[in-house]
Curated annotation (Swiss-Prot):
Broad enzyme group: transferase
Function: Acetyltransferase involved in the biosynthesis of curare monoterpene indole alkaloids (MIAs), natural products such as diaboline, a pharmacologically active compound used to regulate blood pressure. Curare alkaloids act as animal glycine receptor antagonists. Catalyzes the conversion of 17,18-epoxy-17-hydroxycur-19-ene (Wieland-Gumlich aldehyde) to diaboline.
Family as reported in the entry's similarity comment: Belongs to the plant acyltransferase family.
Any one annotated GO CC term: cytoplasm
PANTHER family from the UniProt entry: ACYLSUGAR ACYLTRANSFERASE 3-LIKE, F21J9.9
Organism for this UniProt entry: Strychnos sp
Name this polypeptide is given: Diaboline synthase
Entry annotated with the keyword Cytoplasm: yes
Reaction equation(s) it catalyzes: 17,18-epoxy-17-hydroxycur-19-ene + acetyl-CoA = diaboline + CoA
A GO term, aspect molecular function: acetyltransferase activity
EC number: 2.3.1.326
Localization, UniProt: Cytoplasm
Main location: cytoplasm
Amino acid sequence: MGKITKFVKSKVCNSTNRAFPLIVNHHTMASFQIQIISETLIKPSSPTPPSLKQHQLSDYDKTMHHMYTPVAFLYTSHGHGIPSTDEVSQLLKNSLSKTLKHYSHFAGRLVGDSHVDCNDMGVKLLEVRVRCPMAEVLKRPNTDAQDLVYPKGLPWSMAKEDILVVAQISYFDCGGIAVSADISHKIVDVASITTFMNDWAAMARNSSYKPSPQIVSPTILKMDDVPATAEDDNMKENICQSRRFLFHDSKIAELKALAVNSGAENPTRVELVTAILHKCAVTASTAALGSFMPNILLLAVNLRSIISPPLAKTSIGNMSSCYAISATHENRMKFPLLAGELRRSKIKLFQKYGKQLNESELLFLNSTDKAHESQKLSDGDNFDCFIFSSLCRSPFYEVDFGWGRPVLVYVPNCPFKNTFFLIDTPTQDGIEALVTLEENVMQIFENDEGLLAFASLIKDS
């Protein structure tokens, strides 16, 4: 049995004996209730040995915000034979406990910006009963879903406590289940989250499974001068709106033909979608402001396979960086040009750094390049920064706890302006883009005919 500490008695409430809060959420098309069943601390299945009691953050980890990075996995009961609520609860708690034995710092507590105290205090796990069928969530991903499958207000928030991981199991009336995780960016990037969730799921399917995460050594990523973690303009409070857009593979193929015919060298599907989104976002921003503003585009890239020698795919820690393109004149904001520049920037990064430099040199110089690019723009007029992250080709849809693959991997709306998240569609036949822009910019962006020629707006039904 895994180690479980309960600070709220786990007991399903009925209408005559409500021992737990009942949250009522009203929507124009439906009403639903969220009933908290339990809030639990899950500890590693065996104590962390003294030699591993302190996990030092790498210099790159230290530059990251202690912000909860969210992802949720939704499973329907149709044809999968999901066990009873009690069975699921014990299965997920015990498998999480066993998995944490191999991820001891996930169950520890952050100490300043220097290290994690691997004190086995545990991961917070909430269980909730959702009084509606999961179909209601699948029909309205823009509104209802977030508060049903995540702890309210937690995704993308700056952590107010030292807990590094918060998970939630949501039980729906139809028998469907959602499993979500909010993990501090101080200790993970997207690839790390993928590895952890797949290890947890594999442990649930087979209790004798042995995860083999490779914890990144803090000595790998040394910087001469570690920049302080600071709030950038994109993370300030703004009145923003989020929208989801669907790019079918057939439309991405059309984008590729346009780019290649104009001289771009075999851009990837992510680069193509990034280029058209960036073009249309800048066009909308220009219309809203009344004039063009110089801008920089940052696209995240996983460093594990780039550095020489490459790191294992199961390396845990922040091993992602960005490559950048910038535009100081409006005539550079043409789709084929942007697609070609993205491709060349990535190739330059791979060729210049991947083969010639070791890990620490790659990270330091790449960070220096980004800082120089930003400084070059900010020395003049104000500039806009557009940040893209891709979850495409990541094995999120392989996270199977024993009742099949998820019907949806759900990333909640992001509160930060000019952010874009790309993820494969559940049917693997396209890319879904989650876009967050300032409200006045979004009103123009979502009606851009140049965008809608290749993407469709995902609306709540």
